[in-house]
Regions:
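C-terminal auxiliary extensions adjacent to catalytic cores
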Residues: 2-153
Length: 153
C-alpha cells in the first residue's frame, strides 16, 4: 500500500507526468513557493524506510537451544516491524490525501465529485485548508493521519 501511494504522489506532484497540475500541486507562486515538495521528500523517505522494514525476518534466524534448533520464530519481531510499516503507511497516505485536496481545488472540480468523495473532501478541508504560502506541514500530516484512522467516514 505504501509503495502504491508513494507512486501516486509522484504522479500527482510531477507536472511533466500528469500534464495538468503545477509542480508539487503548488497553488502559490512557482519559483517562490514549494507547494508540497517537502512533503514528498517525507513520503519518499518513509517509503524507503518501509521497504527496508519489509525484509523477511527469517534471514536473521539465530541457532538456539545449544544449537539443537536452528529455526527461530521471529513472529514477535515481524509483528513489531509490520506495526511500524502500517503506521508509516498512514503518513504516506496522509500526504497523498493532502495532495489530492490541493489538486481538486486547483482543477476546481469539487462539483464533479461523488457525494461521498465530496463529503471526504469537505471534512479534509475543515482542518487542512487550501494553502499557497509555504509553512511546515507536520501538524496537518498528523491531523490527516488521525482523520484516516477514524473508523466511520
Amino acid at each position: 500500500l505504501f509503495r502504491s501511494c508513494e507512486r501516486q504522489i509522484n504522479y500527482l506532484f510531477h507536472d511533466r507526468i500528469n500534464g495538468i497540475l503545477p509542480p508539487f500541486v503548488n497553488l502559490g507562486v512557482l519559483g517562490l513557493n514549494y507547494g508540497l515538495q517537502a512533503s514528498q521528500f517525507t513520503a519518499t523517505s518513509t517509503t524507503a524506510e518501509c521497504q527496508t522494514l519489509s525484509n523477511p525476518m527469517y534471514v536473521h534466524s539465530i541457532p538456539n537451544n545449544n544449537d539443537n534448533q536452528d529455526i527461530v520464530s521471529m513472529g514477535t519481531n515481524s509483528a513489531l516491524l509490520a506495526k511500524t510499516v502500517i503506521e508509516n503507511s498512514y503518513q504516506v497516505m496522509a500526504i497523498q490525501f493532502m495532495g489530492m485536496a490541493q489538486a481538486i481545488d486547483y482543477l476546481k472540480i469539487q462539483d464533479r465529485l461523488s457525494s461521498k468523495s465530496r463529503q471526504v473532501y469537505e471534512e479534509i478541508r475543515s482542518f487542512f485548508p487550501v494553502f499557497t504560502n509555504d509553512t511546515p506541514k507536520y501538524k496537518e500530516i498528523e491531523m490527516m493521519i488521525d482523520y484516516l484512522k477514524k473508523e466511520d467516514k
